[in-house]
């Protein structure tokens, strides 16, 4: 989860988020190298006398600055397309959870279980217990088994919402009349927080998401107690 004054990304909890962080570092290094080259050329132009002002063309230079950007774009595009494919691929999910956005709360339905559904509201600040996080705690957490592929079906009952959990690399729009899907896989147990990431009205900031990832046997006990 996030920490006060944190500058970097949240700790990766899913394979997708690990890939996204690696891609971020890869792209940032390319941007840093290009920026350094541009600053170096600008400094040369400002500190040296201009030469070859009468040159009309330079075939070698034009070839380089045509081919080099194309190579750089390919170096960025290939890993990006690979991650997009991974995010869209869902192989034999063990569980499907339907998520519906409302103004201003989330409702969840475990479609593999009969009558296992609930609404999830933010806990008001005055009702928080010591150690709980302001604007991030909910009355009903989404309990899911860890280390297993889970399919989330996401939609909305009213306006546009967005179901996002940064540490899992998840951000999927909840659109009325349309069913989007996402894959959830956690490498470790714990509580993972997110929020609605699409402005949806006056209480947009009060739609937190809390995923509780637990071992499979604990999830089975929880689901049995909820039915």
UniProtKB/Swiss-Prot annotation:
Any one GO CC term of the record: respiratory chain complex IV
List of residues binding Cu cation A2: 196, 198, 200, 204
Chain positions found as Phosphotyrosine: 218
One Pfam family it belongs to: COX2
Transmembrane segments: 23-44, 61-81
GO biological process: electron transport chain; lactation; response to hypoxia
GO MF, one example: copper ion binding
Topological domain spans for side Mitochondrial matrix: 45-60
Recorded topology in the membrane: Multi-pass membrane protein
Localisation: Mitochondrion inner membrane
Function: Component of the cytochrome c oxidase, the last enzyme in the mitochondrial electron transport chain which drives oxidative phosphorylation. The respiratory chain contains 3 multisubunit complexes succinate dehydrogenase (complex II, CII), ubiquinol-cytochrome c oxidoreductase (cytochrome b-c1 complex, complex III, CIII) and cytochrome c oxidase (complex IV, CIV), that cooperate to transfer electrons derived from NADH and succinate to molecular oxygen, creating an electrochemical gradient over the inner membrane that drives transmembrane transport and the ATP synthase.
Subunit structure, as described in the record: Component of the cytochrome c oxidase (complex IV, CIV), a multisubunit enzyme composed of 14 subunits. The complex is composed of a catalytic core of 3 subunits MT-CO1, MT-CO2 and MT-CO3, encoded in the mitochondrial DNA, and 11 supernumerary subunits COX4I, COX5A, COX5B, COX6A, COX6B, COX6C, COX7A, COX7B, COX7C, COX8 and NDUFA4, which are encoded in the nuclear genome.
PANTHER family: CYTOCHROME C OXIDASE SUBUNIT 2, CYTOCHROME C OXIDASE, SUBUNIT II
Protein's name according to its UniProt entry: Cytochrome c oxidase subunit 2
The gene coding this protein: Mtco2
């Amino acid at each position: 989860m996030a920490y006060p004054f944190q500058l970097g990304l949240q700790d990766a909890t899913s394979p997708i988020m690990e890939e996204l962080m690696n891609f971020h570092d890869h792209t940032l290094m390319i941007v840093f190298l290009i920026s350094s080259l541009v600053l170096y050329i600008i400094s040369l132009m400002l500190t040296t006398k201009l030469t070859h002002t009468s040159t009309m063309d330079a075939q070698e230079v034009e070839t380089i600055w045509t081919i080099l950007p194309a190579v750089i774009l390919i170096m960025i595009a290939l890993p990006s397309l690979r991650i997009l494919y991974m995010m869209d691929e869902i192989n034999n999910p063990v569980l499907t959870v339907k998520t519906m956005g409302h103004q201003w709360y989330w409702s969840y339905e475990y479609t593999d279980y009969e009558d296992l559904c609930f609404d999830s509201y933010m806990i008001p600040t005055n009702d928080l217990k010591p150690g709980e996080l302001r604007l991030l705690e909910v009355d009903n957490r989404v309990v899911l088994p860890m280390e297993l592929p889970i399919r989330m079906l996401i939609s909305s009952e009213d306006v546009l919402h967005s179901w996002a959990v940064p540490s899992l690399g998840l951000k999927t729009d909840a659109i009325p009349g349309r069913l989007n899907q996402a894959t959830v896989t956690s490498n470790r147990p714990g509580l993972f927080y997110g929020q609605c990431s699409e402005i949806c009205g006056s209480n947009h900031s009060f739609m937190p998401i809390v995923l509780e990832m637990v071992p499979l046997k604990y999830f089975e006990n929880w689901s049995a107690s909820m039915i």
